[in-house]
């Protein structure tokens, strides 16, 4: 637990940014698909 801010050699904030962007992107695609009518296929 000495390196709480760093996981291996990747900064924790970078992981959070990437995961957050992917989550927002997936939610946007899901809502867009539902709005267009293709949400049932996901």
From Swiss-Prot:
InterPro entries: PSII_PsbJ, PSII_PsbJ_sf
Annotated GO CC locations: chloroplast thylakoid membrane; photosystem II reaction center
Record carries keyword Transmembrane helix: yes
Membrane topology: Single-pass membrane protein
UniProt xrefs under SUPFAM superfamilies: Photosystem II reaction center protein J, PsbJ (SSF161021)
Membrane-spanning segments: 10-30
Entry's localization field: Plastid, Chloroplast thylakoid membrane
UniProt-listed GO biological process terms: photosynthesis
Keywords carried by this UniProt record: Chloroplast, Membrane, Photosynthesis, Photosystem II, Plastid, Reaction center, Thylakoid, Transmembrane, Transmembrane helix
Pfam families: PsbJ (PF01788)
Keyword set includes Membrane: yes
Domain of life (superkingdom): Eukaryota
Role of this protein: One of the components of the core complex of photosystem II (PSII). PSII is a light-driven water:plastoquinone oxidoreductase that uses light energy to abstract electrons from H(2)O, generating O(2) and a proton gradient subsequently used for ATP formation. It consists of a core antenna complex that captures photons, and an electron transfer chain that converts photonic excitation into a charge separation.
Assembly with partners or alone: PSII is composed of 1 copy each of membrane proteins PsbA, PsbB, PsbC, PsbD, PsbE, PsbF, PsbH, PsbI, PsbJ, PsbK, PsbL, PsbM, PsbT, PsbX, PsbY, PsbZ, Psb30/Ycf12, at least 3 peripheral proteins of the oxygen-evolving complex and a large number of cofactors. It forms dimeric complexes.
Family note: Belongs to the PsbJ family.
Protein name: Photosystem II reaction center protein J
């Amino acid at each position: 637990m000495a390196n709480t801010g760093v996981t291996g050699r990747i900064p924790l904030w970078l992981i959070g940014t990437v995961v957050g962007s992917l989550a927002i992107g997936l939610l946007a695609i899901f809502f867009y698909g539902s709005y267009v009518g293709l949400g049932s296929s996901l």
